[in-house]
């Protein structure tokens, strides 16, 4: 132990300005910083593959992640799942760490040796195992699976984070090593779950894509089709079969809403005309809203946007790492389950977009390559606003307002009908309520 204390002294005696900046950066919070890194990776990989010469589209392969198209294509469902797995693994790992902290009750190095500089905020929390290293271990293990082509970058961030905790006087090396090992061990449970959660089959195949169309036609409706040239297969049409976090598969199916208005109904004609009039008469305010909530290609997606909103509100609260992790896990499990219920609904009804029913509608944002009903933005936003309103009740009205604006942005952009958006918000709220049930019964409140 004395040798480990001396290692800190050696680092501090030779500390550079760059190292001081890194200490400041990482001391903002481990869960926060790794969520930012995850959002960065999602944005980097949120790029739909370009077509082959024969008009077909290639699919990214996890077995060859650096070949074009690079794996993953982190579209909204993939991203929602990534945020959920990383957050849930970090939370469970930190809960376990808190047990061992209390059991071993090792004081922080700066409390053992007062000659050490303290370069981070002090606390009475036992230092073994290091909570930061637990977060690192869980993040690295999950991100290796989710972003296999980025392991060098991920490992470099992990080494930087661990080294900073020693330089700062917060932890000795054995605190770090124990924390990282614990984080990795807990995350392995989530890796095993992820490998069997059916996400690997979410892209479907030609037979499935054809059946979605013919089933819709058999109901007397007009099926959705890709408006891209050449036509692109629908985005992850079997994602609705992925294993949920907050409820079982029967509950997921029960959350599927009733059908959209029939394509031949007067209501659908009216809703199509409403979108056409919005597009014909855009305002600067509405156009700004469209772009603010677009969250399209090369962004961290709608779930990432809500993580960003949450993080900004969590920072002033000075939550502990385990509280941060719990909040992010509740939020991101809600967003993943919202994606699952939403994608189940989209591909069950296979309903067309406004531009398909009226080609005169010229959209103000990109047209997503999947069916309209229900709106993904609306479902994500309803779920996020609901659980965030529980976590920070004084912000509940603001979150609801944001969710409504995000939902309306898809109408203003010309890519969704009113029924897509209104029903999507309600479905999202229903999913978010399951997260509240989890929160009120997990013993942490």
Name what the model sees in each region.
Residues 1-445:
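Acidic/polar surface patches and capping/hinge elements
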